[in-house]
């Protein structure tokens, strides 16, 4: 028995792995940017930091996955957007520190290599990288029979960006009286899906719920996470933003306080929050308490900005989209987030 046959009998298809690499090359090529060194397939991805033109560079990194949203991608057999979710979860975190994404690496683990399916996943990763301006410089596809079912896979990523040292955003400049501006989310994004799956466990995904304005449920649930890089970078370059919050797991309550010092709080005008239809549906069909929704979901705001009052108009001018003035920074009395 040859070594190749022995490995195949253990459930690992080396040839399928080679096919995956060949299939994804054209998607990786879409993401190339200045600074990338070497070619796909080396032992390590390389990037020339001097090509960024940043005078005092500070590297900012972030890593994340997609959580159980993957289970819906598998259930509905739709794999071409889940990669964008993975990129978004990483690059939105580093943009919150004032960093421009430079490059990205992905990790896919599966029970059985399916080259067509994995190409779809990586095509979504590449699309996310294009939207973020980040190069996909490497990754790993691990076939692990026995660890995962044949149709199952997991996806995670790692992003590195660069910030000018003087432009790092850490919330230390946020002060009482600053205005909180919200940028719309595209949907649920990539958090809260254990609850989402429970609420809609008995649904096929083809339902046209009245709250969803003619869209099939599965399309709304798998709407890819918005990437905020191109919206936020011009604001960072002009130093118009004092704090940025990526509204992920924990919703408003957990994420907004990460934007400012412990002696401050956020006062939110709930009437100004652009709540998306899917959140109204989740609250209704899941019988979820209204206040708990703000502890779990983004509620229609995926990125929060803390801005000086005198800079609000300039920020709105630079952003070619609706901007929601949903709150302000106050002195902390008790709670870190007060929703009125």
Curated annotation (Swiss-Prot):
GO BP: 'de novo' IMP biosynthetic process; adenine biosynthetic process
Keywords assigned: ATP-binding, Cytoplasm, Ligase, Nucleotide-binding, Purine biosynthesis
UniProt subcellular location: Cytoplasm
Name of the molecule in the record: Phosphoribosylformylglycinamidine cyclo-ligase
This enzyme's EC code(s): 6.3.3.1
Top-level class of the enzyme under EC nomenclature: ligase
Presence of the UniProt keyword ATP-binding in the record: yes
Pfam families linked: AIRS, AIRS_C
Family: Belongs to the AIR synthase family.
Pathway where this protein functions: Purine metabolism; IMP biosynthesis via de novo pathway; 5-amino-1-(5-phospho-D-ribosyl)imidazole from N(2)-formyl-N(1)-(5-phospho-D-ribosyl)glycinamide: step 2/2
Highest taxon, organism lineage: Bacteria
CC per GO annotation: cytosol
Cross-referenced InterPro entries: PurM-like_C_dom, PurM-like_C_sf, PurM-like_N, PurM-like_N_sf, PurM_cligase
Gene Ontology molecular function, alphabetical: ATP binding; phosphoribosylamine-glycine ligase activity; phosphoribosylformylglycinamidine cyclo-ligase activity
Primary location recorded for the protein, binned into one broad class: cytoplasm
Native organism taxonomy: Bacteria, Bacillati, Bacillota, Bacilli, Lactobacillales
Reaction(s) this enzyme catalyzes, per UniProt: 2-formamido-N(1)-(5-O-phospho-beta-D-ribosyl)acetamidine + ATP = 5-amino-1-(5-phospho-beta-D-ribosyl)imidazole + ADP + phosphate + H(+)
């Amino acid at each position: 028995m040859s070594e190749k046959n022995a490995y195949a009998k253990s459930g690992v298809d080396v040839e399928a792995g080679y096919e995956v690499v060949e299939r994804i090359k054209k998607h990786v090529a879409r993401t190339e940017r200045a600074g990338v060194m070497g070619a796909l397939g080396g032992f390590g991805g390389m990037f020339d930091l001097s090509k960024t033109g940043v005078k005092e560079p500070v590297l900012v990194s972030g890593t994340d996955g997609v959580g159980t949203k993957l289970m819906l991608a598998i259930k509905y057999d739709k794999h071409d957007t889940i990669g964008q979710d993975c990129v978004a979860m990483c690059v939105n975190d580093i943009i919150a520190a004032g960093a421009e994404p430079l490059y990205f690496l992905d990790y896919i683990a599966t029970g059985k290599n399916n080259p067509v399916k994995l190409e779809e996943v990586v095509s979504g990763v590449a699309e996310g990288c294009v939207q973020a301006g980040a190069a996909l410089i490497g990754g790993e596809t691990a076939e692990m029979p026995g660890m995962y079912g044949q149709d199952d896979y997991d996806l995670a990523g790692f992003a590195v960006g660069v910030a000018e040292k003087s432009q790092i955003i850490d919330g230390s400049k946020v002060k009482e009286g600053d205005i909180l501006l919200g940028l719309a989310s595209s949907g649920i994004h990539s958090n809260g899906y254990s609850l989402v799956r429970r609420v809609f466990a008995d649904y096929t995904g083809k339902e046209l719920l009245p709250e969803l304005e003619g869209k099939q449920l599965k399309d709304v649930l798998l709407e890819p996470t918005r990437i905020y890089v191109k919206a936020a970078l011009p604001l960072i370059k002009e130093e118009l933003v004092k704090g940025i919050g990526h509204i992920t797991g924990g919703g408003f309550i957990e994420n907004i306080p990460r934007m400012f010092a412990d002696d401050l709080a956020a006062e939110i005008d709930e009437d100004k929050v652009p709540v998306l239809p899917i959140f109204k549906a989740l609250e209704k069909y899941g019988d979820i308490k209204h206040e708990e929704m703000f502890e779990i979901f983004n509620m229609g705001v995926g990125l929060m900005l803390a801005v000086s009052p005198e800079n609000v108009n300039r920020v709105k001018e630079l952003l070619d989209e609706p901007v929601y003035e949903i709150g302000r920074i106050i002195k902390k009395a008790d709670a870190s987030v007060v929703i009125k």
